[in-house]
Amino acid sequence: MRESLSWIAVTAAAFVMAHAGAVAQTPPAAGGAAAAAAPPVAAAAATPASAPAATSPFTTGKAASGEGKAALCSSCHGPQGNSTNPEWPRLAGQSAVYIAEQLRLFKSGARDNPIMKPLAAALSDQDISDLAVYYEAQTPTGLEADPSYWKAGEALYLSGDSAHSVPACVACHGPVGRGNLAAGYPALRAQQSVYVVKQLNDYASGARYPGPHPEQASRNGVMMLTLAKRLSPEEIRDVASYVQGMR
């Protein structure tokens, strides 16, 4: 009973935070994620996943300046932030607030990555803001969800797993995976599933924030460090495939 009440409390808290000051979400199209009988399959890599998120009011960056500074980033993250390498994250349409936070974490060493750490260390605060705003303004292109795992991933994303005290992902990341600017929750739509699997495993193992106080590294660190440990390898695989196919 205590565990059940704890799960309900976590779900309710996540839902409230996700909707407090949240930007408007675009509802799924007819036959979308909540009602579709078939997985969300992208028409082609060049087809936009959906309109870009509104420019964040929380940064002082300039997208035009960020475009020039993103030339080096594109070698891994792809043109306009649409990475084609499944191990490297897509940045197109990602929250500027979230991107800026992660770059600062890489710069400080609170988040570890042998490639990103030295690159972020060379960035000024203005560089970080410019890059963050630029990538937020880009449009993520569509990817396919694996039909073998999509339905199970949809159920976990939309409803959670009460048996293991896992709240629904939708509460924080939104019905179409746009995230929540005000709360600092990242967009997940059209993200590479291989990358999502790695990040969830890194949360569970503590590798994402390896410092002595990982719960203080990021605003959403406490929640994800806890929840990722409750997910089975199959659940991680399923939900990662589902978000890859989101528009």
Regions found by a protein language model. Name each.
Residues 1-60, 104, 233-234, 244-247:
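N-terminal export/targeting leaders of redox proteins
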Residues 28-70, 84-85, 137-163:
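Electrostatic cytochrome c docking/interface patches
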Residues 56, 63, 67, 81-111, ...:
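Gly/Gly-Pro-rich "capping" loops immediately C-terminal to redox-active cysteine motifs
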Residues 73-80, 131, 166-177, 239:
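The canonical Cys-X-X-Cys-His
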Residues 82-83, 109, 137-148, 156-163, ...:
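Inter-heme linker and motif-flanking segments adjacent to c-type heme-binding CXXCH motifs
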Residues 121-143, 199, 226-247:
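C-terminal capping alpha-helices of c-type cytochrome domains
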Residues 125, 149-157, 216-217, 222-225, ...:
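Short amphipathic alpha-helical linker/capping segments at the junctions of internal repeats
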